[in-house]
């Protein structure tokens, strides 16, 4: 996936109210950017960090800039949670995600469960329901999800277990949008309920996949599969 051009480099001043970030651009201008990430962004919102912003030409937008990348522990991290669904779809279509090949159709945002929309539904033959999660927290060499308590994420795991019980395929897909982290594991210290449900889901037949993304100011793309440490 090619990122918007041009991107504007700067330095993070602060992130606040979840969806706002003040950034000093390289020319000295201070702007407020939209932060497209509702998590805690632990490890990715340190004041003074190098960042890249995209700029919208939509005059109706309240905030013209969107925060896209941050330098975290020497690696560019993609913090835009709107991108992973597109990355996974692109990875399926170009053959990178071998585990999800062989389906005739890919449909986004299909209703299922209780007032939910699955990120991707793969159809023909059979059906595969795919929930995609963005991972940017890395500690001790392991990528961790979630970075904040997520009742929505817990609900998705329950719904994936139900589609598997009904005979369909269910997949929880972790996209690690940074270059470090050799595996993915549930962040039990942050959301122990999510960790318990992930392990329960895997035992029930939900497939847990994780891929690392190459993240640069020019592009983001899935590159390699990582193990998911979801055992007891």
From Swiss-Prot:
Pfam families per record: SfsA (PF03749), SfsA_N (PF17746)
Cysteine pairs bridged by disulfides in the record: none
Single GO molecular function: DNA binding
Family: Belongs to the SfsA family.
Listed name of the protein: Sugar fermentation stimulation protein homolog
Organism of origin: Geobacter sulfurreducens (strain ATCC 51573 / DSM 12127 / PCA)
